[in-house]
Regions:
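Motif-centric detector for short Cys/His coordination patterns
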Residues: 1-152
Length: 152
């Protein structure tokens, strides 16, 4: 059997699954001890499926339309970029270099550095801001690539 990687844009709504039946979160739901939270997933070809909440939220990012753009197509937003970065660590190396490591929500890590010419001018906070700007630019680029792949 071959292994594949895929990317597609889907629509989904929060729902519950009870005894194999899917109920929208917003509608009446029968009481049951076997109530599982998740999402009803709608694919572009009309296929529908169920995804458990934790699996869905790990695999999919919400897309929004940016009102400042001249299109109604979904796009990458600053919020998406910020939310994709789970955690960061900052370290000073030597007496004038800042290194920031960022852990992304998919487990990938990005490392950036900034430095100044003179140790007297070194400011870790400023170095961190510069590094985070570089990291966010890379995340924006990578999410843009992912969205373009899903569109085509």
């Amino acid at each position: 059997m071959k292994t594949y990687i895929g990317t597609k844009i889907i629509q989904a709504e929060p729902a519950f699954r009870i005894d194999g039946e899917i109920y929208p979160e917003s509608g009446p739901v029968p009481r049951s001890m076997n109530r599982e939270e998740g999402y009803r997933v709608h694919y572009p070809d009309g296929y529908e499926s169920w995804s458990p909440k934790d699996v869905f939220e790990q695999a999919y990012l919400p897309l929004t339309v940016n009102p400042d753009l001249r299109t109604d197509a979904p796009s990458i937003s600053q919020q998406m970029v910020d939310d994709f970065i789970l955690e960061t660590w900052t370290q000073t190396m030597g007496d004038k270099t800042t290194v920031v490591r960022a852990l992304l929500r998919n487990g990938f890590e990005i490392v950036e550095s900034s430095a100044c010419v003179s140790a007297e001018n070194y400011d870790e906070k400023l170095g961190r801001e510069i590094c985070l700007g570089k990291i966010k630019d890379k995340v924006w680029f990578l999410l843009g690539f992912l969205l373009q792949t899903a569109v085509h």
